[in-house]
């Protein structure tokens, strides 16, 4: 195990994640596939392995403590697989579905699922199935919080939670979107400020849940189907 993965294993423990040898091996495989495919399609703009391991792998693991054991997770706008693939590598108890409409990135995710050979990891494309199926909706690069909730909430069970991974202006965005979220019947559940090591990379996790006393039918009506 090289020093970078030793750092990943140590820092992951800060977020309640214990990485065994199998998980570290899968992260190593994932790293190499990311770099290979990035030569063909634009998956990321990181400069080196250290940035990928800290700003992508470790960053993705910061939400793990909020995900209940055995939960079903939908990662919308997964792109290169973040945060869904690192979460699944580290938490084999979870069922993780990656949603990606950009065709090149979709096929990369399909490839990674075949390479990793991890059970209960799927990739989907936007369509019209699977309403009210998931316990958690997670996203790192989808866009405004209110848009994420509007787009993703139909996929969640009644008590489902949305977790949006934001940068340093996350709370400002939450405040701006509050009137829209309130109208849709959603309220903030938690706000967690995190600083990742080495790069002093700041992350704000924002959790939202339905306010059942104010819930409306505002939101999209399409669902998701498997293309496996």
Residue spans of the language-model regions?
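A general structural signal for well-ordered alpha-helical segments in protein cores
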Residues: 5, 27, 57-60, 84, ...
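Conserved SAM-binding loop of SAM-dependent methyltransferases across substrates and taxa
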Residues: 80-93
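S-adenosylmethionine
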Residues: 94-97, 101-228
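Conserved glycine-centered beta->alpha loop in an early N-terminal alpha/beta scaffold
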Residues: 77
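Class I SAM-dependent transferase core
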Residues: 1-70, 74, 104-121
């Amino acid at each position: 195990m090289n020093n970078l993965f030793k750092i990943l294993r140590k820092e992951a423990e800060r977020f309640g994640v214990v990485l065994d040898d199998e998980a570290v091996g899968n992260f190593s495989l994932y790293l190499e596939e990311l770099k290979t495919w990035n030569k063909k399609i634009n998956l990321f703009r990181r400069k080196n392995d250290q940035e990928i391991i800290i700003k992508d792998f470790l960053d993705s693991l910061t939400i793990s403590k909020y995900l209940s054991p055995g939960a079903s997770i939908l990662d919308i706008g997964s792109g290169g697989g973040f945060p869904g693939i690192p979460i699944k590598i580290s938490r084999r108890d979870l069922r993780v579905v990656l949603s990606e409409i950009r065709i090149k990135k979709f096929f990369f995710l399909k490839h990674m699922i075949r390479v990793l050979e991890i059970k209960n990891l799927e990739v989907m494309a936007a369509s019209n199935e699977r309403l009210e199926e998931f316990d958690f909706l997670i996203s790192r690069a989808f866009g405004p919080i209110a848009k994420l909730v509007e787009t993703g909430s139909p996929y969640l069970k009644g008590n489902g939670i949305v977790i949006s991974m934001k940068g340093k202006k996350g709370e400002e965005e939450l405040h701006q979107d509050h009137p829209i979220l309130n109208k849709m019947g959603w309220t903030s559940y938690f706000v967690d400020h995190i600083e990742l090591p080495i790069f002093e990379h700041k992350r704000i996790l924002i959790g939202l849940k339905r306010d059942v006393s104010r819930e409306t039918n505002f939101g999209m009506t399409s669902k998701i189907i498997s293309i496996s």
